[in-house]
Amino acid sequence: TQLEAACPNVVSCADILALAAR
């Protein structure tokens, strides 16, 4: 995802938040 390219380190946290928000 775009986040991965922007912050591959934060992807884990951002991804979880995005999935939870969904």
Curated annotation (Swiss-Prot):
Pfam families: peroxidase. Its cofactor is heme b; Ca(2+). Coiled coil: none annotated. Gene3D superfamilies: 1.10.520.10. It catalyses: 2 a phenolic donor + H2O2 = 2 a phenolic radical donor + 2 H2O. Keywords: Calcium, Cell wall, Heme, Hydrogen peroxide, Iron, Metal-binding, Oxidoreductase, Peroxidase, Secreted. It is an enzyme of class 1 (oxidoreductase). GO terms for cellular component: extracellular region. Its EC number is 1.11.1.7. The keyword Transferase does not apply. GO terms for molecular function: heme binding; lactoperoxidase activity; metal ion binding. It is found in: Secreted; Secreted, Cell wall. GO terms for biological process: hydrogen peroxide catabolic process; response to oxidative stress. Binds 1 heme b (iron(II)-protoporphyrin IX) group per subunit. Belongs to the peroxidase family. Classical plant (class III) peroxidase subfamily. Removal of H(2)O(2), oxidation of toxic reductants, biosynthesis and degradation of lignin, suberization, auxin catabolism, response to environmental stresses such as wounding, pathogen attack and oxidative stress. These functions might be dependent on each isozyme/isoform in each plant tissue. This is Peroxidase 5.
